[in-house]
Amino acid sequence: MLKDDMLEVALLGKTIGLKGAIKLHNRSDFPSQFKKGAKFYLTDGEILEILSFNKTNFVAVFKNYENIECAAKLTNKILYQSKEITKKTCKLGKDEFFYFEILGLEVFENEEKLGKVADIFEAGNFVFEIATDEKLIKKGFPKIFYLPYTDHFIDKISIEEGKIFSRFGFEILQNS
């Protein structure tokens, strides 16, 4: 299993009942991906297929784990999904992006590279943590700064170019 291509989507919790049901602790923004027939991966590369899923309680039964003894072996394991399958099964709206598409993008303002997106936080609106470009750090700017993901500060996101074009990002950096 290629770790770079995989996304953590759920933590498997405790078993429920005698027939192998297990609680899923969702770690994704797309709970609709959990349904009968969906396949996921464990860290060791094993593929788990959902035989039944209760979306109200977030409880699943996996193929070949249909009893409590087998299902108990899955407790505290992490479910993964590939980025490719995620793109196919989890639909986004206009001007929406997956986190994995945004992380690592370079941030530019007026053709000057400000840095790269290191993390994304949800604080009311989304906020990008930017790791400042080395050239700017050498000039005395902070190593990180935060850029709100709003139309006021983000002019354009181009996944194809690997860039985010900002407005007023440099002012935020100067005042950080």
From Swiss-Prot:
One of its GO terms (cellular component) is cytoplasm. Keywords: Chaperone, Cytoplasm, Ribosome biogenesis, rRNA processing. InterPro entries: PRC-brl_dom, PRC_barrel-like_sf, RimM, RimM_N, RimM_N_sf, Transl_B-barrel_sf. This is Ribosome maturation factor RimM. PANTHER family: RIBOSOME MATURATION FACTOR RIMM. It comes from Campylobacter hominis (strain ATCC BAA-381 / DSM 21671 / CCUG 45161 / LMG 19568 / NCTC 13146 / CH001A). The PRC barrel domain binds ribosomal protein uS19. Binds ribosomal protein uS19. An accessory protein needed during the final step in the assembly of 30S ribosomal subunit, possibly for assembly of the head region. Essential for efficient processing of 16S rRNA. May be needed both before and after RbfA during the maturation of 16S rRNA. It has affinity for free ribosomal 30S subunits but not for 70S ribosomes. One of its GO terms (molecular function) is ribosome binding.
